């Protein structure tokens, strides 16, 4: 019984500490519908499993509580592997030659901003804040 309580306490404690970005893996249409219903923008992460900068962003930026809270309040976030169909199509349409690539859309599908490459959390957040502020000024 003590072992079970310890394991539950440990599991709950580590889960609470990880307020990271919640990424959807649904279709782009489903993600857009979620954003419409929730009144949020759409954030898309185009990555590849073999990409060191992509993995660095996952470990050092998207895992942070402050980044997770900021993004979850403002975006429905989705991620697509550029080695698979949806990711490849998005990269072809909106991309450059480099990943990671981050795209921000409004609920009408208009591209509001693009962030290319890895960055530390503060720089990444500054870039997102700029995109969000520009969108707010349009309204």
Report residues per predicted region.
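Non-catalytic, surface beta->alpha helical segment in thiol-disulfide oxidoreductase systems
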Residues: 97-137
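Sec-dependent N-terminal signal peptides
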Residues: 4-13
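A short beta-strand-turn-helix
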Residues: 23-41, 71
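Hydrophobic beta-strand anchors of alpha/beta hydrolase catalytic cores
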Residues: 43-44, 77, 102
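Thiol-based oxidoreductase modules, predominantly thioredoxin-like and allied folds used
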Residues: 22-26, 62-86
């Amino acid at each position: 019984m003590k072992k079970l309580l310890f394991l539950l306490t440990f599991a709950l404690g580590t889960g609470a500490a990880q307020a990271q970005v919640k990424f959807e893996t649904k279709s782009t249409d489903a993600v857009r519908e979620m954003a419409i219903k929730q009144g949020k923008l759409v954030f898309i992460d185009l990555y590849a499993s073999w990409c060191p900068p992509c993995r660095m962003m996952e470990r050092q930026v998207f895992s942070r509580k402050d980044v997770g809270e900021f993004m979850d309040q403002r975006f429905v976030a989705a991620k697509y592997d550029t080695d698979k169909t949806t990711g490849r199509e998005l990269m072809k349409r909106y991309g450059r030659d480099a990943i990671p690539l981050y795209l921000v859309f409004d609920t009408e599908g208009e591209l509001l901003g693009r962030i290319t490459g890895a960055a530390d959390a503060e720089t990444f957040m500054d870039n997102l804040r700029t995109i969000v502020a520009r969108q707010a000024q349009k309204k």
